[in-house]
Amino acid sequence: MKKYHISMINIPAYGHVNPTLALVEKLCEKGHRVTYATTEEFAPAVQQAGGEALIYHTSLNIDPKQIREMMEKNDAPLSLLKESLSILPQLEELYKDDQPDLIIYDFVALAGKLFAEKLNVPVIKLCSSYAQNESFQLGNEDMLKKIREAEAEFKAYLEQEKLPAVSFEQLAVPEALNIVFMPKSFQIQHETFDDRFCFVGPSLGERKEKESLLIDKDDRPLMLISLGTAFNAWPEFYKMCIKAFRDSSWQVIMSVGKTIDPESLEDIPANFTIRQSVPQLEVLEKADLFISHGGMNSTMEAMNAGVPLVVIPQMYEQELTANRVDELGLGVYLPKEEVTVSSLQEAVQAVSSDQELLSRVKNMQKDVKEAGGAERAAAEIEAFMKKSAVPQ
C-alpha cells in the first residue's frame, strides 16, 4: 500500500476533534503521514495520536459560557461562515510547500472543503454528527431562517471584500466518501443513505490523558451526570441533581465543567463524587445510567458501553439525538425547561426499571461494536485513495 500525506482539517471543539484522534492513530500506524490543522489547545492530543499539529488562529471561542451565549443568540451560522474565510489563507500558508495527497474535513469545517477545491485534491468528509444527503438535512425552521439571514449578511460582506461566494449549502453536499461516527441503525432516515456513506460507529481508541477512576465501584448502581464540554455552565442543574439523588441508592459521579468550582456546590452528599472533569470512557465502563446533554460523542460512548440514557439537550442537534434515543427506546428525553428535582427522579426510575429498554440498549451496543470504528474508517480511506489512483 502506498503511503500518503493526509491533511485533516477541523474546527476547535472537543465534540469534533475527539472522534478523529483514534483515526489519526490508525492512519499513522499504517505508515501514512497525517498533518492536522487545529488550534493550540488541541495540538497535544493530535501529537499524542501520532499526527503533526499545524496551528491556525481563530476567533471561535470554545468557552462554555460564550458558546451558550452564541447558541442563544443564534450567532453560530455567521460565526462559522466568517471563520472559514479567516482560516483559508492560513491553510494556504501552512501547506504552501507541502501539499497533501488527500484532505479529510469535518462536516462543519467549511475551510477544509474550500481548501480541497482550491488544491484540486481528493476529499473525504467526516461526520461527527448525523450525515446529510438529498433526503435528510440538519436544521429546523428557526435554524434555517437564521442561516438564510446569516448568508444574506455574509454575501454582502463577500462582495464588499471581493471574495468568492461561500454558502452553508456546500456543507450539506455529500462527498464521494463520507465517514460517519455512528452505526447506521442510529442515523435518522438511515434507509435513504447509499454506499457513499460509511457508518463506522464511534472512533474511540484509548484516551491518552486517561486518569484513574475517581471512586471504587461498590454494590450500588453507578450514575454518571455530565453536560459535556461546551454546554455545562448551568449550576442550577447540578444543584437539582444533588437534591434529587442525595442519600439515594445511587452512587453518583458528576462532571460540572471548567467554569464551575465543585466546592461552590455546598453540602455535597456522601454518595456523590463531583469534579470539573472525569475520565468518561472509564466511568461508563462501570456505569448503570448516564444523565447527558445528548452530544453525539457522549451518546455513542454510552451505547458502546451499553449504558441507557436520560437526555437533557442543550441545543438543536442534541434535541434530535434526544428524540432519536426516545424513538429507538434507548432512554428518556427530558426537555431542559422541564427539569426539576422530581422529573429527574422520575426519569431515572423509568429508565433503570425498564428491562426491555435495557435489552434494546444492548442490541445497539452490538451494532456499535460491529460497525468497525477507527480500523474500518482507516481501511475505507485507503481503499478510496487506491481507487482515486493518487500518485505516491
Swiss-Prot record:
It catalyses: an NDP-glycose + an acceptor = a glycosylated acceptor + NDP. The keyword Phosphoprotein does not apply. UDP binds at residues 18, 229, 255, 278, 293, 297-301. Its EC number is 2.4.1.384. Changing residue 318 to A: Leads to about 2-fold decrease in specific activities. Changing residue 277 to W: Enhances the catalytic efficiency of UDP glycosylation, but reduces the relative activity of pterostilbene glycosylation reaction. Glycosyltransferase that can glycosylate a wide range of substrates, including various flavonoids, phenyl ketones, curcuminoid, lignins, zingerone, triterpenes, stilbene and anthraquinone, using UDP-glucose or ADP-glucose as sugar donor. It also exhibits O-, N- and S-glycosylation activities towards simple aromatics. In vivo, the broad acceptor tolerance of YjiC might function as a detoxification agent against exogenous xenobiotics to make the strain adaptable to the changeable environment. This is NDP-glycosyltransferase YjiC. It comes from Bacillus subtilis (strain 168). The lineage of its organism: Bacteria, Bacillati, Bacillota, Bacilli, Bacillales. The gene is yjiC.
